[in-house]
Amino acid sequence: AYWFHGTRTSADNTFDSGLLPLNQTESLVMDMLVNLAPDVVVKERLQAWNFHAGVPDTLFRTRTRNEMHWGPYGHLVQEVHFHARKLWQHDYLRLPELVEDVCNAYQKKYGQDLTEHYLKVLKPCIVCFRADIEYEKGAFEAALSYAYTSVRELPPDSGAVFGIDRHGISVCLDEIVNVEFTKLHELDG
């Protein structure tokens, strides 16, 4: 099956190393945020956090230390990413969780919200990859739900939400079908 991993990243990210689980992306995410920091002060402060579990945020530490959160993850229905909030999903095209955690920690510690800056410099991206379906009935139900709403020109409903968890195993470069930077985001507000 084809799966769709949503993120927001630097425009030059080619995913040459594949899609990595969170425990392997921690330093890459921090390097990206440091390199794209709005000024020297922010850059130095973020650099000081750039070591394993160095971000002073409980969620960041949980996500990078606990393999239950590592993923990588993907949705079976690509359009779910464009209606994430309506479907009670995290909006990865807006900000990935680790980036959000860093912004939250920075605001708490230094009183400056970096969210708008990183929304401007990072670009929404969907990585399509191939992987086996582990639960065929769930995938079939999601596909039927999506077909039902799609032919009626409606956005997907919660029945179309079905995903894959790679359980800490990377998506290799040869499993990646396409990397698409998109301007489409949150079609339903």
Regions found by a protein language model. Give the residues of each.
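Histidine-centered active-site/metal-ligand motif
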Residues: 5
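Low-complexity, serine/threonine/proline-enriched polar segments
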Residues: 23-72, 76-85
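Conserved NAD+-utilizing ADP-ribose enzyme module
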Residues: 1, 10-16, 20-22, 27-31, ...
